[in-house]
Amino acid sequence: MDPYCPFDALDVWEHRRFIVADSRNFITPEFPRDFWMSPVFNLPRETAAEQVVVLQAQRTAAAAALENAAMQAAELPVDIERRLRPIERNVHEIAGALEALETAAAAAEEADAARGDEPAGGGDGGAPPGLAVAEMEVQIVRNDPPLRYDTNLPVDLLHMVYAGRGATGSSGVVFGTWYRTIQDRTITDFPLTTRSADFRDGRMSKTFMTALVLSLQACGRLYVGQRHYSAFECAVLCLYLLYRNTHGAADDSDRAPVTFGDLLGRLPRYLACLAAVIGTEGGRPQYRYRDDKLPKTQFAAGGGRYEHGALASHIVIATLMHHGVLPAAPGDVPRDASTHVNPDGVAHHDDINRAAAAFLSRGHNLFLWEDQTLLRATANTITALGVIQRLLANGNVYADRLNNRLQLGMLIPGAVPSEAIARGASGSDSGAIKSGDNNLEALCANYVLPLYRADPAVELTQLFPGLAALCLDAQAGRPVGSTRRVVDMSSGARQAALVRLTALELINRTRTNPTPVGEVIHAHDALAIQYEQGLGLLAQQARIGLGSNTKRFSAFNVSSDYDMLYFLCLGFIPQYLSAV
């Protein structure tokens, strides 16, 4: 059709024609009127039968999908196990490789330490034979020969004790009623331990005794966190600085110490200085922390710090702060008044950090207030060293040898030379002997120093597991009242923490999957807290020696000063019995 144009074409420049835009000028073809009425746009409605067929088809499809999903879910665990099996094998291989690497690294460190101790000399530079094994030799009592061990002195001696009993085995070896009680409690509370230890006929199991000694050695160790200094090293540095601040740097009878080994050799005089300083304070010293400000079931401090004032009540920490060994605790010096009270920051000068750099030179700072878990362990170590000094004071190791429960002659042929004195001062004569700290000095020089050189990360409870046993037993001997006499019939319930940690060590020997690390740390923390509390009780007692606590030490088979030395270092005193 012809378009309708209300306006005529207009002429513009250059004679071009165009149509003016207007709604009435819309050009379109004619649209069919019945277009939307065609059948394609008007389908008939579904009938009920057709709807039923559609619903049935949908239901059948859903059922088939569910069946396929169920079959796939049934096959899923098998497929997961098939995929995990090679991963587990790889993990076991990696664990074995890591263990081999750790062993190789430890051997390399020991070799480097042995080479580092070799004297720099001329010639071919070769070390004399036996130098590498000299570090593995210790001497506990001055009139006994040195003992050579492989990895762990108490454990190695246990093997020799049971081997020395011959065919009778462990049925003729006893260690005291305290160990018997712990073993019976372990069997009762943890029956699974019978799978890895031989408890037949009421014998003392060698496996159990090994696990128990390892648990005693672990009391003072810190398993949470990574540190470059041990609590034992920090304790020795603190004792030296206290002696230096109270006696002066030049008040030594011999040359000034230049190595950490020199400090270990002078531990007795440093401990005597600590005892004298605490004695001048007046009043009864408190070897306890603020329990209301410490975690109840956790030894480590969250974030490295406890609540303010939790540690300052301990007499050791208070003494170190009073004499300038420890700097001011965080928060003791107000920040707004620091310019008037502490203008040069002297209150925060840390001599321990400088001493660590001078004697250990490890390239790492040592600020005990920033790691209060280590500070707490350091104070416990100092307290334990003081207890050891009191236990060994004026000890007589030359008394009648028949009074000693431990006889090295039963274990080692020729351990006691024939020309040695078989009988010394005993009875009333032994009281006239005032050996002072001679036994402790010999122990530091011939036992502590070699063990420290072999393992600089060693802690005090690893050196003296017998002390840990005494501290754990200290609460059992606590008097109930001044006018009451109570017979203790308990079956070792106070040693639940020690029993649990020992049982975990025994159970892990037979488990494919070891106990979770968190459970082991929880058990260790409970034991460490009990050791700390018992140590405080033991340190506060006026008399802790063998003469005033015969019954307590008899539970550990200790009957003489000679036995006391070996018990502290080994953690047990073996005794042979005739077979039934």
Swiss-Prot record:
Regions crossing the membrane: none
Keyword hit for DNA damage: no
Region (Interaction with major capsid protein/MCP): 1-49, 1-50
One Gene Ontology cellular component: host cell
Main location: virion
Pfam families per record: Herpes_UL25
Cited InterPro entries: Herpes_UL25 (IPR002493)
Compartment annotation: Virion; Host nucleus
UniProt record, GO biological process: symbiont entry into host cell; viral genome packaging; viral penetration into host nucleus
Region (Disordered): 108-129
Ion transport among keywords: no
Biased composition (Gly residues): 119-128
Coiled-coil segments on the chain, per record: none
Domain of life per record: Viruses
Keyword set, alphabetical order: Capsid protein, Host nucleus, Host-virus interaction, Viral genome packaging, Viral penetration into host nucleus, Viral release from host cell, Virion, Virus entry into host cell
Subunit structure: Heterodimerizes with CVC1. Interacts with major capsid protein/MCP and triplex capsid protein 1/TRX1 at the pentamer vertices. Interacts with the large tegument protein/LTP. Interacts with host NUP214; this interaction might be essential to the capsid docking to the host nuclear pore. Interacts with host TMEM250.
Stated family: Belongs to the herpesviridae CVC2 protein family.
Function as written in the Swiss-Prot or TrEMBL entry: Capsid vertex-specific component that plays a role during viral DNA encapsidation, assuring correct genome cleavage and presumably stabilizing capsids that contain full-length viral genomes. Participates in the interaction between the capsid and the tegument through interaction with the large tegument protein/LTP. May mediate the capsid docking to the nuclear pore allowing entry of the viral genome into the host nucleus through binding to host nucleoporins NUP214.
Name used for this protein in its record: Capsid vertex component 2
Organism: Human herpesvirus 1 (strain 17) (HHV-1)
Gene name for this UniProt entry: CVC2
